[in-house]
């Protein structure tokens, strides 16, 4: 029976259904739920060195704002359902993101992620595959 559940929340597409499902699973098992908003920087600063400072700062602020919105939505749902929870955000460059997410997912009894949608590509489409093959922990994929 899972005691600690993580839901990895995409910041660049709607996460309401994912949050609702994760809250329902956590409520079913009376588990602690961590909402982790994953914002990623697509630009590699070593490729576009001249413009990297300005672009990276803009991407960072946009990613943090999007993460804050998703985490607020998560907190409202978890409080409404009386689920013990924490909310976190992670912001990383794309080449280190897989390692970061995999290491974080190893700490939980169950990881809940959104299923990638090929008709609507997202920056976080790699999450499901990274957790499935890298964490060694159970994963629930929500369409």
Which ranges hold each PLM region?
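A short acidic, glycine-rich active-site loop
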Residues: 55-69
């Amino acid at each position: 029976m899972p005691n600690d559940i993580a839901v990895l929340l995409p910041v660049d597409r709607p996460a309401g259904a994912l949050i609702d499902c994760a809250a329902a699973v956590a409520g079913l098992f009376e588990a602690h739920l961590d909402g982790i908003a994953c914002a990623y920087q697509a630009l590699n600063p070593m490729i576009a060195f001249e413009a990297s400072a300005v672009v990276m700062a803009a991407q960072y602020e946009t990613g943090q704002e999007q993460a804050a919105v998703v985490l607020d939505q998560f907190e409202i749902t978890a409080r409404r359902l009386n689920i013990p929870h924490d909310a976190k955000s992670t912001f990383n460059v794309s080449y280190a993101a897989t390692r970061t997410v995999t290491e974080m997912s190893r700490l939980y009894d169950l990881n809940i992620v959104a299923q990638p949608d090929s008709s609507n590509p997202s920056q976080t489409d790699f999450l499901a595959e990274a957790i499935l093959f890298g964490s060694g922990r159970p994963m629930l994929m929500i369409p």
